[in-house]
Regions:
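A short acidic, often aromatic-flanked loop/helix-cap motif at beta-alpha or helix-coil junctions
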Residues: 33-35, 81-83, 113-114
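Acidic, metal-binding active-site segment of PIN/NYN-like and related structure-specific nucleases
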Residues: 46-63
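Solvent-exposed interaction patches of small proteins and small membrane subunits
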Residues: 1, 21-23, 61-64, 102
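Mid-chain, well-packed structural core segment of small domains
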Residues: 60-93
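N-terminal first-folded block
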Residues: 2-51
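Charged phosphate-binding loop/patch that engages nucleotide di/tri-phosphates or the phosphate backbone
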Residues: 96-117
Length: 117
């Protein structure tokens, strides 16, 4: 079963949504200190076979994080509470539809999600 690692920039509402969908979830703060670098977050996710969930668009750069190099990354494109709620609707749909996250980058906004393998 897929398990998720929530970046510290992501709201607790997102944590609850993923957990309520039946998936194991950890926050980066459960594992290490506040202010962990992107590199530290990435290494932890890979070593523990976790899918990263973040608002950090840097994780969407396939030159730095090629899809085949990770267990999965979900980048949420939310800019305020309203857009976050819309992203949650799309994220909930993604979690119901998708079964394979390894090696895939998902970009989630308030209207749709895109995936790159």
């Amino acid at each position: 079963m897929a398990a998720f690692l929530i970046d510290e920039c992501v709201s607790f509402q997102t944590y609850r949504l993923i957990s309520a969908s039946g998936f194991p979830v950890k926050t980066i703060l459960d594992i290490t200190h506040s202010g962990a670098t992107d590199s530290e977050l990435f290494k932890i996710a890979q070593s523990q076979t976790l899918i990263i969930v973040t608002l950090d668009s840097g994780f969407g750069d396939v030159r730095i994080y090629p899809p085949k190099s990770h267990n999965g990354i979900i980048v949420l494109k939310a800019f305020d509470l309203n857009s976050l709620q819309k992203c949650h609707t799309v994220l909930e749909m993604l979690l119901k539809i998708e079964s394979e996250f390894k090696g895939t980058l998902f970009i989630v906004d308030g209207n749709k999600y895109r995936k790159k393998k």
